């Protein structure tokens, strides 16, 4: 079966899907409202299924890739949820000590796509650690709908503490140089912005279509930032002008790019919103940014 692309859907359906993914409407509401945009003989429920992630087809680096060593690791988050879990990936050969990258998932916890992102970074010479924010609720449940519902039950303040603790855990590993950056997607992109405020030791922050922090918090940012925005993303982009003004006013080092024609989630190659050209360019910029700030 040929994989669908964003262009195969009407803008109205993609907007409804974005609302569904972010918990603004239920599955039933999506089906009811998307029915107006289906073609004869197709159901809105079937339409939704084509928009959901295909983790097998979208995988880039296999779980058992012999070039890597991967493991599940636990760490303490005393100011957050307590005992947390995550996925650690590193090259099987090469330098004993490597710079670290914290990989922060979307609003569904540590799913196979984010584990794949960690493996991709490990192949680039990083110690990549992807925490699972759903650990206190049993971890990623293997189902995106269930994961989304669980995520809404998490304490937002504790969440930030869990990722601060993850940064500290990664930076303190014996095989980490102590230079640690962070990359996040959607919820994770917003968390990168929050970590930039909370963690002065953050070596570099890369946010893919992530929510911004309030302007009054920007003076606390010490890390250089790389910010990727989708051209078609009203919800996230609405906060960008004020954020950019605050970054400039406070002399924060940053790069920002808007990928025209790309939808929110354009880097996620497991869904039709994936935009290969935008994702390739954003990923190349991300790797160059980490090289400049973490490997020097």
Model regions and ranges:
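Gly/Ser-rich "nucleophile elbow"/oxyanion-hole loop immediately N-terminal to the catalytic nucleophile
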Residues: 144-183, 293-295
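N-terminal secretory signal peptides
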Residues: 1-29
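Short beta-strand/loop motif that positions the catalytic acidic residue
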Residues: 227-229
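Cap/lid segment of the alpha/beta-hydrolase catalytic domain
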Residues: 108, 134-157, 265-270
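Primarily recognizes the serine-hydrolase "nucleophile elbow" in alpha/beta-hydrolase
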Residues: 165-222
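N-terminal cap/lid segment of alpha/beta-hydrolase-fold proteins
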Residues: 57-94
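Short beta-strand element of the alpha/beta-hydrolase
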Residues: 97-106
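N-terminal export signals
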Residues: 18, 27-53
């Amino acid at each position: 079966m040929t994989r669908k692309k964003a262009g195969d859907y009407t803008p109205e359906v993609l907007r409804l899907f974005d609302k569904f993914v972010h918990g603004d409407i239920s599955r039933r509401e999506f089906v009811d409202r998307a029915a107006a945009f289906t073609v004869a003989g197709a159901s809105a429920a079937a339409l939704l299924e084509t928009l959901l992630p295909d983790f097998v087809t979208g995988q880039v680096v296999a779980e058992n890739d012999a070039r890597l060593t991967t493991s599940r690791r636990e760490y303490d988050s005393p100011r957050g949820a307590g005992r947390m879990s995550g996925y650690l990936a590193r090259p099987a050969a090469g330098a004993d000590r490597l710079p670290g990258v914290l990989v922060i998932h979307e609003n569904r916890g540590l799913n196979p796509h984010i584990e794949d992102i960690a493996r991709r970074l490990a192949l680039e010479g990083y110690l990549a650690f992807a925490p699972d924010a759903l650990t206190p609720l049993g971890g990623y449940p293997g189902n995106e709908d269930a994961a989304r519902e669980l995520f809404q039950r998490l304490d937002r303040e504790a969440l930030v503490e869990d990722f601060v603790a993850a940064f500290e855990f990664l930076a303190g590993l014996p095989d980490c140089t102590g230079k640690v950056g962070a990359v996040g997607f959607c919820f994770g992109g917003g968390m990168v912005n929050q970590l930039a405020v909370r963690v002065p030791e953050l070596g570099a922050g890369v946010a893919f279509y992530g929510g911004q922090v309030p302007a009054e918090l920007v003076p606390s940012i010490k890390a250089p930032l790389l910010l990727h925005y989708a051209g078609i993303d009203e919800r996230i982009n609405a906060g960008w002008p004020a954020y950019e003004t605050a970054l400039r006013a406070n002399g924060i080092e940053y790069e920002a790019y808007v990928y025209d024609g790309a939808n929110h989630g354009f880097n996620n190659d497991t869904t039709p919103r994936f935009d290969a050209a935008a994702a390739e360019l954003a990923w190349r910029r991300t790797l160059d940014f980490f090289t400049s700030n973490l490997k020097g």
